[in-house]
Amino acid sequence: MMKRVIKLGGSFLTCPDLESRLQRWQETAPPAHCLAIVGGGGLINSIREIDAVVPLEEQTTHWRCVELLSHTFEIMKQRLDWPTIERVVELEHWIQNPPPLGKITLVRVDTFYRSSGSPVCESSIWNSHGSELLPENWKTTTDSIAALLAWGIHASELVILKSCSIPPEASLAQLAESGIVDQAFPHIAKELQNVRIEQLAVDG
């Protein structure tokens, strides 16, 4: 049973033809049971801009940005006709009883990724080791958070969909150095079976 995690870049929040682009991508992707998360886009960038002028406490800022991802989740939920997961128990049910192949389910990030002080139900598949894989600062973005989800569900592959072009021969370390993926990504990606980083093609 192939399981795939997809990360949609936050820049797609303002992409007018996102739905048709995703449909074309799905038509060419190998069949799999799919979970997806969405990045923070301009919401997170605004916090970066504030931090550049008035330095903020790293860990607090990290979790503040994670909280903002609930808003980008709601926006994408409104745009896309995808089922959603918003509670730990729903995620665990998906793992045990995934929907039909090809169906993409949108996951709210704080379903599986929370600060150490936040309560998570005892039946959760997530443990402290998962959180330790990611630094709680700007080195971690939704690229690495998607990788954490892929690691947690033992996904067959992780697909990072970007709006920018991807150098075909670049290593993960080189992609991190150029800012295409975050700095934590090369480390956590070592925990995964397969990783693909792709540009979501423009229609036409």
What feature does the model see in each segment?
Residues 35-39, 160, 198-200:
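Short internal beta-strands
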Residues 48-145, 149-152, 176:
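Ligand-binding beta-strand-loop-alpha-helix segment within the catalytic cores
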Residues 12-14, 42-45, 113-114, 166-168, ...:
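Short, active-site-adjacent cap segments at secondary-structure transitions
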Residues 137-138, 142-147, 172-204:
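Polyanion-binding loop/helix "lid" in catalytic or ligand-binding cores
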Residues 153-170:
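Glycine-rich phosphate/pyrophosphate-binding loops
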Residues 32-48:
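Glycine/small-residue-rich interface belts in oligomeric ring/scaffold proteins
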Residues 1-36:
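N-terminal glycine-/serine-/threonine-rich phosphate-binding loop
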